């Protein structure tokens, strides 16, 4: 076991030396198992240039997960300021790199991907894109798949709350097996998005979880461009009436929902999520009786969206009967974020008005819980 650890330390040293050699102009020396203050570093590498000396403190791990990265980074932040704290592991996942950056800790992997940053940015090395072989962990649930994302949606909807596994499984907007919730819980904890405190699941990083969900979010299962007589608002009225007359659940979405959540969001093409039943041929053909609704290749003023999962309708009830149902701020953000240009601007407006404060307060609450444990 000791030999394996020593071999990994030598590997880490060689990779860092190679990175510094690529830059040129450094004289490099190293020490293994060196004590620095109250801490002990696996490897300390000293890199001297003509006008500066940089000391890199390497913590070497055979395998590192986002969950273990958090505690490791908290410890490494206590190192003296003249050291550049760096994690080395053969494989560094994007999530581990993200957490390390959040704490101001550097990282290096076997392939040479790295971020090394000294105080005052006198040294800044950021290399990405080198392929590192990795295998996905077995038996781990993808939290962003259609069913699993229902769990994520419920957690983000009340980010300061603690949840029991069964409570999540039985939530009206979730309704999945206890087994799936347990798997997703494990993934969220291991990926550093959540913690378990007194047998309750809390979100540690709701902002990061939402950002990564947005990157993976697939959008509607189907999009049908439609034209109705009149403008986008008239098209929304026509589809709303068609849905009511045929008892079809629906919700204004995309820019249509964004405008109602943040008035600065402007749109000339509406979007509406319609329950799968609305796509049945017999029901769909009735749209022609509503402002001449028809499918078009160009010139659409409304996009008819088939949901990837019924959870898009969560929290879509209108504030009053006079208003049409629209997607929640969370769902609206996801749909707008995937649209380039104005979509991203609109997503930011919705986020700032309706999501940012709640998510940040949730993260603050979890930090308080963690401090209570110390």
Feature map (PLM): residue ranges:
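Nucleic-acid nuclease catalytic cores
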Residues: 80-104, 108
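Loop-centered beta-sheet repeat module
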Residues: 151-214
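Hydrophobic alpha-helical interaction segments
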Residues: 281-374
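A short alpha->loop->secondary-structure connector
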Residues: 102-115, 122-126
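Conserved catalytic cores of phosphodiester-cleaving nucleases, focusing on short active-site segments
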Residues: 39-80, 85-87, 333
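Acidic-basic catalytic patches of nuclease active cores, encompassing PD-(D/E)XK
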Residues: 1-35
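Short gly/ser-rich loop at a beta-strand->alpha-helix junction or flexible surface loop bordering the NTP-binding
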Residues: 221-310
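Short alpha-helical segments that sit at the start of domains
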Residues: 123-152
């Amino acid at each position: 076991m000791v030999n394996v650890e020593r071999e990994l330390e030598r590997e880490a040293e060689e990779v860092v030396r190679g990175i510094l050699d690529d830059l040129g102009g450094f004289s490099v020396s190293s020490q293994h198992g060196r004590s620095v203050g109250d801490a002990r570093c696996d490897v300390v590498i000293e890199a001297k240039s003509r006008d500066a000396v940089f000391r890199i403190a390497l913590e070497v791990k055979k395998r590192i997960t986002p969950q273990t990265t958090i505690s490791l980074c908290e410890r490494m932040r206590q190192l003296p300021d003249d050291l550049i704290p760096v994690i080395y592991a053969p494989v560094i996942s994007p999530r581990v790199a993200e957490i390390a950056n959040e704490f101001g800790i550097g990282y290096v992997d076997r392939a040479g991907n790295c971020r090394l940053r000294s105080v005052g940015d006198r040294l800044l090395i950021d290399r990405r894109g080198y392929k590192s072989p990795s295998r996905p962990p077995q038996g781990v649930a993808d939290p962003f798949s259609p069913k699993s994302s229902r769990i994520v949606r419920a957690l983000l909807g009340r980010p300061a709350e603690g949840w029991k596994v069964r409570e999540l499984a039985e939530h009206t907007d979730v309704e999945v097996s206890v087994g799936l919730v347990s798997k997703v819980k494990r993934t969220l904890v291991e990926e550093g998005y959540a913690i378990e405190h007194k047998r309750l699941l809390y979100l540690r990083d709701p902002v990061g979880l939402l950002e990564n969900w947005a990157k993976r979010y697939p959008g509607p299962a189907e999009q049908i461009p439609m034209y109705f007589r009149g403008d986008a608002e008239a098209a929304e009225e026509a589809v709303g009436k068609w849905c009511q007359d045929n008892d079809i659940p629906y919700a204004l979405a995309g820019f249509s929902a964004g405008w109602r959540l943040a008035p600065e969001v402007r749109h000339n093409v509406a979007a509406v999520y319609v329950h799968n039943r609305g796509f049945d041929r017999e029901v769909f053909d009735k749209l022609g009786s509503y402002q001449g609704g028809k499918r078009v290749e160009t010139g659409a003023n409304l996009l008819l969206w088939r949901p990837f999962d019924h959870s898009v309708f969560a929290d879509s009830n209108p504030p009053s009967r006079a208003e049409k149902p629209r997607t929640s701020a969370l769902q609206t953000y996801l749909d707008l974020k995937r649209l380039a240009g104005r979509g991203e601007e609109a997503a930011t407006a919705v986020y700032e008005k309706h999501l940012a404060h709640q998510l940040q307060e949730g993260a603050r609450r979890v930090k308080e819980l963690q401090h209570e444990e110390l």
